[in-house]
Amino acid sequence: MADYRKTLNMPDTPFPMRGDLAKREPGWVADWQAKKLYQKVRKAAAGRPKFVLHDGPPYANGDIHIGHAVNKILKDIIVRSKTLAGFDAPYVPGWDCHGLPIEHQIEKQHGKHLPADRARELCREYAAEQIERQKKDFIRLGVLGDWDNPYRTMNFSNEADEIRALGELFRKGFLFKGLKPVNWCFDCGSALAEAEVEYQDKKSPAIDVGFPLVDNERDKLAHAFGLDTLPEQPVYIVIWTTTPWTIPSNQALNVHPELIYELVETPKGLLILAAELRASALERYQLEGRVLAAARGVALDRINFRHPFYDRLSPVFLGDYVAADAGTGIVHSAPAYGLDDFVSCTRYGMRNDEILNPVQADGTFAGSLPFFGGLSVWDANPKIVDKLAEVGSLFASGTLTHSYMHCWRHKTPVIYRATTQWFVGMDRLPGREAVEPGSATLRELALKAVDETQFYPAWGKARLHSMIANRPDWCVSRQRNWGVPIPLFLHKETGEPHPRSLELLEQVAQRVEQHGIDAWFKLDAAELLGSDVAQYDKMRDTLDVWFDSGTTHWTVLRGSHAADSQWPAALYLEGSDQHRGWFHSSLLTGCAIDGRAPYDALLTHGFVVDGQGKKMSKSKGNVVAPQEVSDKLGAEILRLWVAATDYSGELTISKEILDRVVEVYRRLRNTLRFLLANTGDFDIARDGVPVEEWLDIDHYALALTRRLQEQVTGDYARFEFHKIVQALQNFAAEDLGAFYVDILKDRLYTTKADSRARRAAQTALWHITQAITRMMAPILTFTAEEIWRVTGNDAEDSVMLHTWHELPELGASDEILARWELIRSARAEVQKVLESLRSDGRIGASLQAEVRVRASGARFDALASVGADLHFVLITSRAELVRVETEADEGVDAAPSSHQKCGRCWHFREDIGVDADHPELCGRCCTNLHGDGESRTHA
């Protein structure tokens, strides 16, 4: 038999079957940087509508982890998709550079006793080094951005503009100084922001403590309970606490005004307990008790008890925050160490200088504190319990495992500790309106802004709303060295800021703009204050790093990168923890400065967990490093994994999951390779066929592609990337692989190379390739560029310099789709029958079969519409269509062909050998080889 392979139009392409991503991707990255692709994209997009995704800055410390990779890849997908959608979508990456973690790194390397200016210099150098390390890894992921000109919160211009932002808050009255309990970390030696506190289980002592009644208050207490006199027994009001270390600082006792409290007679004396908790409390104390009387909490207001071991009073105050869900229903109040306690005591007139605060910054009691001076609060706990037992005030002692505040950096317990700090006020400022009369409070502005913001996923709105509604004032001052200063001068006697503070803030900002934050720390106050210098102290506090990142809408979008940006940003995108972090701080500063959020929408992604849903940790050995994935499988696989995962929940990753992603990629690549290989000899300008002259099935493929593009571009706009991956998979596997290109192979391979039928098919494939390449480019960016180069585009060109592909216009798409869906359903039934023949060993390939299809109604009409090309659609050597009256009569009859097989097209036909010169060929192949070529109308 002659070899007719060379007479076929065999597919050919330089696009390899194997991607070799890990080896080839670095070359693409280098190419993009060499030809300054980001700048070219900016130039191509100039004048389009802006879409600004503002980058939440990662902290400049340590290598990037898988969470960073997820975040940056999601951002890149969005920025690229918006660019392709016709927007000018710049991406300016940023870094958070100040703060304690970097200070700690410098202390580790150089010790704790460096001069402050030298420490700041080393911190700046360290942050710059870390940025370069992280930048290299982000670029390796294929993230396109202004990497040569990122924003850094330690840039002099950013530091200066942050001071100006602080000035705006000061000018509008949101900034105030006050004594309040704030989150305090002993290891940091500083206050913590809400976002720097995390909760972990902690085992704490749980004790019940009796405070004895003052002798001369017995009649008053009897009256409160409706009694004439009290029995001649000691009287205790009993509290329950898990923080014995706060007992030395007790200054009051809180009851709920509406709760019922009972006076209970026990062998140990008369006890005051909440009625709802009496039984459980007496069980803890192992005491029998008899209720003598009951009263509402309001009746106990201002009755005095005595501190268990110090000679001072502890009055009863009313507090709505007291609950009856645990303990005794009475809360001991140490106003220096609890926000509710502080509010309650100050409401009752307690002055700041009356609040007892013996715990020092390092967590030890002041040496002057009787019994416990010099001890750490944790070491003091058992000694305080012993002291309470010694004086007869310990009613019960045990332990409790509960969720407790910990420092996010040190993983050590933190406390509330009253210190004089600077706050951004959420409601009202002491002694004056928070803002100009008639305007809203910051809390009201922020809640309104939350309502006006679009959230992806939608549940984020309720979460952020709740956080804003319930949060305390924001403590923005820190007692640290490496940070943007709060450059105020405070009067030595009154503590009030200098009357020219706004003017002075701007003068400091101008100096910082030239010399960085050292300009403040090295400043001789006399240079700015003149003769006032003797009356004022220069502040040493620095700003919370969340204020650094939280004001980037001011310092970056309207500051260092204003020319490339837009305010407000279209989108902020971060992990779900940023509802209490960057989303939160940005919202507060935005509302304080501008009265609105600095973003139109917020998108949150979940955290990455291992294949079993467990949190990753080095100790568990389940960490997946993005660098390792890129080096082994390619960053493209990481990008595809991110896109294919529903990021609204936890993102699961493991070797097995990545292996499945590799398989998805392989299938997509093979489909694309087929498209490229079968358009290798095609030039759209030279060989393109007008859409009106395409075959019917090509029109169907075009309609499918248009439908896909509409879905995909819509999913990009809705940030639903996992749906895109699924849609591309289905299109490649089902619409193309299992149907269109399966049918198309005969026309592509066997018809004349330049026949209208083949060129029409190639034109359709070219448009499909163009559309898919652009649709996948935001996700599979390396592969899209590879395809772009293979399709004959100039080396200086890039898919990112274009927009979504403009598909040829086609009328009656809905009719075509509906008709061909009927044809596909009939074809599926034919394939089932053929598979049965194959299982019985009666046929091998489907071309060995001849079929008879019985159809009725719309199905018959659809099948009849393709005329004599039906057997091409069914991939059989012969197909007969018979009309029947009802669906019940429909069916498929199939049998092996009795004819010979053509040596070229492999169809079984009765006209084999009709040309004596080619006895092994069918008439169709003879026409295609030596005649004018066959005529195709539909397939």
From Swiss-Prot:
CC terms in the record's Gene Ontology section: cytosol
Compartments it resides in: Cytoplasm
Requisite cofactors: Zn(2+)
Domain of life according to the entry: Bacteria
Catalytic activity: tRNA(Ile) + L-isoleucine + ATP = L-isoleucyl-tRNA(Ile) + AMP + diphosphate
Listed EC numbers: 6.1.1.5
ATP-binding is among the record's keywords: yes
PROSITE patterns: AA_TRNA_LIGASE_I (PS00178)
Pfam assignment, any one: tRNA-synt_1
Residues spanned by motif 'HIGH' region: 58-68
Record note on cofactor: Binds 1 zinc ion per subunit.
UniProt: ATP binding residues: 618
GO molecular function: aminoacyl-tRNA deacylase activity; ATP binding; isoleucine-tRNA ligase activity; tRNA binding; zinc ion binding
Membrane spanning stretches: none
Binding-site residues for L-isoleucyl-5'-AMP, renumbered to this chain: 574
Subunit structure: Monomer.
Function of the molecule: Catalyzes the attachment of isoleucine to tRNA(Ile). As IleRS can inadvertently accommodate and process structurally similar amino acids such as valine, to avoid such errors it has two additional distinct tRNA(Ile)-dependent editing activities. One activity is designated as 'pretransfer' editing and involves the hydrolysis of activated Val-AMP. The other activity is designated 'posttransfer' editing and involves deacylation of mischarged Val-tRNA(Ile).
Entry note about domains: IleRS has two distinct active sites: one for aminoacylation and one for editing. The misactivated valine is translocated from the active site to the editing site, which sterically excludes the correctly activated isoleucine. The single editing site contains two valyl binding pockets, one specific for each substrate (Val-AMP or Val-tRNA(Ile)).
Protein name: Isoleucine--tRNA ligase
Organism encoding this protein: Aromatoleum aromaticum (strain DSM 19018 / LMG 30748 / EbN1)
